[in-house]
């Protein structure tokens, strides 16, 4: 990573954003010499890899087991009890401004990102009645931290004085991969205890950061928590500002991107399950699907945790024993629930589009969809109602699902009392357990983009890359990195990638951060 090269287009407002240049090479394949590449998985990572490979002239086939693109951000049609149709999905996702590479992918079909709409705040409400807001907090560190302390009702100057400053100093200079070497053996909870982070403000760390991994913070690696603080708060000048799609995911994002890929010549094979892959004697790779065997010169596996484990386990010719053990050790986070309710009356006009919650017995956030999504707004306008979405993360494996679903509705009525008299026109409850878990001590075992085979790369939010990225941005970044690695081997230049700064933002902050290691 180097400073921004002269004349390049910076993707955000942060002048200290890092840039990763691709290996030098020719601009694209010449007609007739383009290799064939398989991309297995049609989520963000696979879409990024397929996009870049196709843009450089590779002959790409994209395999996706579901009937639509988008992976964990896919959507599907459902008919409601009132006879209308709606698009259901896995629900609210925040497209933060520092998601440079994901936003770059979306710019392929929406150069001005007009299909994303900003939400003005990221409020967090505690059951004790206090609400934290980031709307008025300065965006550039260290003023963001100072401004938050000055404005927060749950974290004040007095709390700052009780913290173990030396234990907190590593937050000021997070570096990848060094942060994992220092903190991967510690849990997120244990780190906050060491810092003496105020108990009343624990929800700030857990709801904003660690719960975003769908994980119990007692299991989550502290290195991931520090990385999240760096990406969203202490390392980036983009701030905790984000956008959301103004229509459901298929209409706003994946439909246009799928059309773009097909115009580039990509063969998109949805509804196609890849059972196994194996090296070909003459070079390249063969994939076995329900319809037969397909041959390619290279492949990107851009699968979720369970899919990656299954394909590798069924493909004995892949990798080394140590590499296969690393894949087998990839863990899945606990199950979570997304409940969407169509109600016959509106919530109060001042209710935000998104509200993080803490202390409400399992309810992690509430979204009011008509505040930002056109389809929900049209339903609400026709029916005089509202569309709300409730999330519960890290639900116990033995929990009774119907009780959890009822509990979320009860919590909604507690947080937004005006919903107590509302009739539920219809509801959908999505239970999933397919997100990666990053437990204490796991970083060194995680699979990387490069594999023992030069013709095979991995991508996805479970895949390790030594860059300060997480969640959807890790998926997009590893997708581009996977394509870059294959292109470099073929002598073709890949794509420039952007990240938040890879160290503390200033010499003073880096010097303070270094004190903790002495």
Question: Each PLM stretch: what is its role?
Answer:
Residues 1-37, 55-56, 78, 508-518:
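Extreme N-terminal leader/targeting segments of oxidoreductases
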Residues 3-7, 27, 441-518:
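C-terminal lid/capping helical subdomain adjacent to the catalytic/cofactor pocket in oxidative enzymes
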Residues 10, 102-103, 107-108, 113-226:
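Mobile amphipathic helical/loop "lid" adjacent to a hydrophobic cofactor/ligand pocket
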Residues 32-62:
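N-terminal Rossmann-like FAD-binding beta1-loop-alpha1 element of flavoenzymes
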Residues 54-81:
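Glycine-rich FAD pyrophosphate-binding loop
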Residues 81-117:
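Conserved FAD-binding subdomain of flavin-dependent enzymes
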Residues 228-290, 294-298:
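Helical element adjacent to the flavin cofactor pocket in flavoenzyme catalytic cores
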Residues 296-298, 303, 307-446, 452-457, ...:
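C-terminal segments that line or cap access tunnels to active or ligand-binding sites in enzymes
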């Amino acid at each position: 990573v180097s400073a921004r090269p002269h004349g390049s287009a910076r993707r955000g407002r942060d002048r200290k954003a890092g840039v990763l240049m691709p290996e030098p090479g020719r601009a694209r394949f010449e007609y007739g010499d383009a290799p064939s590449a398989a991309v297995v998985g049609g989520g963000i990572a696979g879409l990024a890899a397929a996009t870049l490979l196709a843009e450089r002239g590779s002959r790409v086939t994209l395999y996706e087991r579901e009937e639509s693109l988008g992976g964990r951000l896919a959507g599907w049609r459902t008919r409601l009890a009132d006879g209308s149709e709606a698009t259901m999905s896995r629900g609210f996702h925040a497209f933060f401004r520092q998601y440079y590479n994901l936003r770059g992918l979306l710019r392929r079909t929406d150069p001005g990102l007009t299909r994303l709409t900003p939400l003005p705040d990221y409020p967090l409400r505690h059951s004790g009645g206090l609400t934290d807001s980031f709307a008025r907090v300065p965006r550039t560190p260290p003023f963001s931290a100072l401004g938050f302390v000055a404005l927060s009702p749950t974290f004040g100057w007095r709390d700052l004085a009780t913290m173990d400053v030396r234990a907190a100093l590593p937050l000021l200079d997070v570096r990848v991969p060094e942060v994992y070497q220092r903190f991967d053996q510690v849990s997120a909870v244990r780190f906050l205890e060491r810092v003496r982070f105020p108990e009343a403000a624990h929800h700030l760390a857990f709801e904003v950061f660690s719960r975003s991994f769908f994980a119990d913070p007692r299991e989550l690696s502290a290195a991931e928590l520090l990385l999240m603080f760096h990406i969203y708060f202490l390392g980036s000048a983009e701030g905790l500002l984000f956008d959301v799609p103004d229509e459901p995911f298929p209409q706003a994002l994946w439909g246009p991107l799928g059309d773009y890929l097909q115009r580039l010549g990509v063969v998109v094979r949805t509804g196609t399950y890849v059972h196994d892959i194996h090296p070909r004697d003459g070079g390249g790779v063969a994939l076995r699907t329900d319809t037969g065997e397909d041959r390619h010169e290279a492949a990107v596996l851009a699968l979720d945790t369970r899919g990656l484990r299954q394909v590798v386990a069924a493909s004995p010719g892949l990798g080394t024993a140590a590499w296969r053990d690393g894949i087998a050790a990839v863990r899945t986070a606990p199950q979570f629930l997304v409940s969407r309710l169509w109600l016959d009356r509106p919530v109060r006009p001042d209710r935000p589009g998104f509200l993080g919650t803490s202390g409400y017995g399992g309810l992690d956030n509430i979204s009011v969809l008509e505040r930002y999504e056109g389809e929900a707004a049209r339903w609400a306008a026709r029916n005089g109602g509202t569309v709300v979405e409730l999330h519960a993360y890290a639900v116990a494996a033995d929990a009774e699902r119907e009780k959890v679903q009822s509990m979320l509705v009860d919590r909604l009525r507690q947080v937004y009392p005006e919903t107590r008299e509302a009739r539920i026109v219809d509801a959908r409850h999505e239970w999933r357990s397919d997100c990666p878990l990053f437990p204490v001590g796991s970083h060194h075992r995680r699979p990387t983009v490069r594999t023992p085979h030069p013709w095979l790369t991995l991508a996805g939010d479970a895949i390790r890359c030594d860059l300060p990225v997480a969640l959807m941005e890790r998926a997009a970044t590893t997708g581009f990195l996977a394509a870059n690695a294959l292109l470099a081997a073929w002598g073709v230049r890949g794509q420039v990638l952007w990240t938040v700064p890879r160290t503390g933002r200033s010499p003073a902050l880096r010097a303070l951060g270094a004190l903790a290691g002495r």
